[in-house]
Amino acid sequence: MELKHVLMIIGIIILTIAPLVMYSGLTEEDGYFGGADGAASDLIMELSPEYEPWFEPFWEPPSGEIESLLFALQAAIGAIIIGYFFGYNKAKYDFESKN
């Protein structure tokens, strides 16, 4: 196995384990993988308690699992679209370089 492949695998392992080690022992109240939405709403209420939202969502998912599923589905669709365009451009470049 080439050195660049070994270094890439080591880098992936470090990037996978580092967040888990850095946040081990923290709970969600301490900011363990907390969301930006919750932090933003807390800050808004702290700065301006009389603030009222402009609108309410027309539909809320029935559970947190459904919300996570929809988020993962959105991420997967985005990854497919981005991957398609990278593959299309790579194939186009390869085709043009052969001709």
UniProtKB/Swiss-Prot annotation:
Compartments where located: Cell membrane
Similarity annotation: Belongs to the CbiN family.
Transmembrane segments: 6-26, 68-88
InterPro entries: CbiN
Subunit structure: Forms an energy-coupling factor (ECF) transporter complex composed of an ATP-binding protein (A component, CbiO), a transmembrane protein (T component, CbiQ) and 2 possible substrate-capture proteins (S components, CbiM and CbiN) of unknown stoichimetry.
Protein's pathway: Cofactor biosynthesis; adenosylcobalamin biosynthesis
GO molecular function: cobalt ion transmembrane transporter activity
Lineage: Archaea, Methanobacteriati, Methanobacteriota, Methanomada group, Methanococci
Gene Ontology CC: one annotated term: plasma membrane
Sorted UniProt keywords: Cell membrane, Cobalamin biosynthesis, Cobalt, Cobalt transport, Ion transport, Membrane, Transmembrane, Transmembrane helix, Transport
Highest rank taxon of the organism: Archaea
Function summary: Part of the energy-coupling factor (ECF) transporter complex CbiMNOQ involved in cobalt import.
Protein name per UniProt: Cobalt transport protein CbiN
Gene Ontology terms describing biological process: cobalamin biosynthetic process
NCBIfam families (UniProt xref): cbiN, PRK02898.1
Pfam families to which the protein is assigned, alphabetical: CbiN
Its membrane topology: Multi-pass membrane protein
